[in-house]
Amino acid sequence: SLNMARGKPAKDQLDLSMPMLDIISSTTECVDEAGTDLRNYGILDGIEEAKVLMASMLDDDPANVIVFGNSSLNIMYDTVMRCWVFGTLGATPWSQLEEVKFLCPVPGYDRHFGVTEAFGIKMIPVPMNEDGPDMDVVKELVANDASVKGIWCVPKYSNPGGVTYSDEVVRELASMPTAADDFRIFWDNAYTVHHLYDDVADQDQLLDIADACVEAGNPNRYFKFGSTSKVTLPGAGISAMAASPENIADIKARMGVQTIGHDKINQLRHVKFLKDADGIAEHMAKHAAII
């Protein structure tokens, strides 16, 4: 039967990653470069090699990266949850406020909206232009309303129009005055390596939100998210987030109560299979050839 669900790779695409399942067997020495036995507990923020790999996708420093399990949506939900329950960097927990609002560029990702809806957060639609969200609307809303705490962004090849945010839009998001000191950009760069063409001249380029925020004097404004869901296997990949050193320290302090660590064997499997940024690009070219 025909499956009309959007966002699911075809069988031929899934088959590309089947050799990854042969990389680790009962005879494999499951240790990282530091010599840590990955079969055991530990390494809250992910093995170093996986942090380096995911940092190449997230365009960030490995020191600012945390590697999780298979789902970036899970990370985003937990990130909203931490802001809701604990607040971020000493700010008032969102749950204690009379009202919390989020900006939602439309068309956008329904699962993003499902997260904010689950917390009772009021969602404000923002029109999308060919270069990203309408920044005149965004800037007015965030400047005048302290209850606007965040914005959902799929900044590259976003569905359904394939929009990539322009440099100007990225810089405006990073630098715009906000009434809320704890305003956060939820930067879901889900399609960062999903180019259709090999020639760099034919690929969209996205300005790094972290660099833009640092340059604008708002280094804690962004949370970046990504995963290998549409790179290797959607149900069995690895995911990661990147943020400022302050935010990462805050997140790890909360995470340390929630978990001892994620699936390090799968992190090792992905490192051995994809290797590095060049390996990811080579693998994604195979996806593009199928499409």
Regions found by a protein language model. Give the residues of each.
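Walker B catalytic acidic pair
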Residues: 189
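Conserved N-terminal helix/loop that builds the PLP phosphate-binding region
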Residues: 1-33
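Conserved core segment of the aminotransferase class I/II
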Residues: 210-288
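Hydrophobic "anchor" residues on beta-strands that sit immediately upstream
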Residues: 150, 184, 223
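Conserved core of the PLP fold type I
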Residues: 29-30, 35-181, 192-217
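Short aromatic-enriched loop/helix-cap "lid" or pocket-rim segments at secondary-structure transitions
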Residues: 14-18, 196-200, 235-238
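Short acidic, S/G/P-rich loop/turn micro-motifs used as interaction or catalytic elements
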Residues: 10-13, 157-160, 232
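Conserved beta-strand scaffold positions in the cores of enzyme catalytic domains, especially
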Residues: 3, 123-125, 222-224
